[in-house]
């Protein structure tokens, strides 16, 4: 079904791109650009939906490989620093004990990406912080913001697959993002905790057990 859904969308995008190259004058060019942007958004939504169902059905398995925790933190900082600055927010990044661990790097980055994206999205003043710490075989990743925060009821709904926040300022809600992240954390054998207060911001804490790669694969602390 993945192939059946993606093929026609790929065709629409492809033919529209060809049309854009041949007809790029006046309003026609803008109309075609709008079609391309809408197709891109639809593709992203489709990929997100398919990702959710794969994880929810237990069909996705971790792809473990050695990676340095600070490399994950650096990737997230590089991506979100300009996003925060452009919105007038501060982004604080702190990395505790660094280590080379055996984990699914792309999924860990996806978790951090989702948390930071929501934190920036729902914060209008103040800032966002990212903290990573590795201790006793457990990676702790914390994202905290000074944003709108959530009521107790909204916190209960936050990880639901199709729940939306009722706050008008957050009318786009979390969508499937947090539901997917919850499933990713579960797939990796971890836990996620939400602490929030309306008008005071939110704090997400993810804890995932993982072994140091050097214990199994002979990596040293100087391995890139």
Give the predicted meaning of each segment:
Residues 37-45:
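Short alpha-helical segment of the dimerization/phosphotransfer core of two-component systems
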Residues 53-64:
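Helix-loop junction within the histidine kinase core
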């Amino acid at each position: 079904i993945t192939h059946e859904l993606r093929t026609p969308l790929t065709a629409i995008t492809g033919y529209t791109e060809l049309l854009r190259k041949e007809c790029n004058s006046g309003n026609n060019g803008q109309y075609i650009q709008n079609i391309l942007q809408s197709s891109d958004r639809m593709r992203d939504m489709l990929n997100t939906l398919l990702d959710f169902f794969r994880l929810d059905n237990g069909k996705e398995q971790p792809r473990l490989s050695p990676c340095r925790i600070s490399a994950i933190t650096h990737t997230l900082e590089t991506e979100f620093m300009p996003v925060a600055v452009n919105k007038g927010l501060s982004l604080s990044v702190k990395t505790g004990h660094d280590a080379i661990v055996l984990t699914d790097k792309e999924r860990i980055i996806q978790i951090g990406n989702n948390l930071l994206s929501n934190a920036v999205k729902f914060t209008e003043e103040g800032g966002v912080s990212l903290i990573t710490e590795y201790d006793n075989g457990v990676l702790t990743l914390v994202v905290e913001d000074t944003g709108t925060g959530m009521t107790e009821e909204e916190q209960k709904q936050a990880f639901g697959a199709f729940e939306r926040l009722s706050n008008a300022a957050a009318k786009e809600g979390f969508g499937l993002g947090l539901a997917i992240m919850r499933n990713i954390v579960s797939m990796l054998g971890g836990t996620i905790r939400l602490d929030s207060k309306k008008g005071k911001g939110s704090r997400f804490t993810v804890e995932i057990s993982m072994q140091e790669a050097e214990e199994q694969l002979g990596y040293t602390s100087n391995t890139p």
